[in-house]
Regions:
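Residues lining hydrophobic/aromatic ligand-binding pockets adjacent to catalytic sites
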Residues: 1-188
Length: 188
């Protein structure tokens, strides 16, 4: 597994929200981002068509920023019937945490870190704030398992270093969300 010593990466995260394309690309340029890795499972938006995959493949390079879609890191996953991530209250987050143990996810992280070693990279999803998005869990993995620094870019220009989610721990090359929670007894 690659780590910061291997790839020298700092990964940023950003959510496009409802920003105009020009404001979004200006935020990226101000942060020194040269590549966007789209981590939406379905890279389109009816409400913000400028953030559809084909549109971004056109206007981001015109702004001097490379664009890649990486479905392996996308959200909207199905939870396992007996997820071990009991510290996560929302099914969508538990489902993504379950996905993070798959070879697809781990290969996607390798691809992300390779891309980040080539150009300063931001992973992007639609949710404006990182703590309500699967980018939060991806950042936990990058920080705790891969030892990569993660910075969250906000629409107002603020940059926040990632602090791992409450209840998370690293174990055997994965993150597990179970700290401080007693598992339910079988049959209850």
């Amino acid at each position: 597994m690659a780590g910061v010593g291997d790839v020298g990466a700092v990964v940023s995260t950003i959510g496009h929200g409802t920003l105009p394309a020009e404001a979004f690309s200006a935020l990226l340029a101000e942060a020194g981002v040269g590549r966007v890795v789209d981590v939406r499972s379905y890279p389109g938006s009816r409400h913000n068509p400028q953030f559809g995959r084909e549109e971004m493949e056109r206007w981001l390079p015109a702004a001097g920023i490379d664009y890649r879609w990486l479905r392996a890191l996308g959200g909207r996953r199905r939870p396992l019937p007996a997820s071990r991530h009991i510290a996560l209250r929302h099914d969508a987050f538990r489902a993504y945490a379950d996905h993070m143990a798959t070879p697809e996810f781990l290969d996607g992280v390798d691809e992300l870190l390779t891309a980040s070693a080539e150009l300063p990279t931001a992973v992007m999803c639609s949710e404006s704030v990182w703590w309500r998005c699967h980018r939060r869990l991806l950042a936990d993995h990058l920080v705790l398992v891969r030892r990569v620094d993660v910075v969250h870019l906000m629409h107002d220009g603020r940059r926040t270093d990632h602090a791992p989610t409450a209840g998370v721990r690293a174990a055997d090359g994965q993150v597990v969300y179970d700290v401080g929670v007693t598992p339910p007894l079988p049959g209850t």
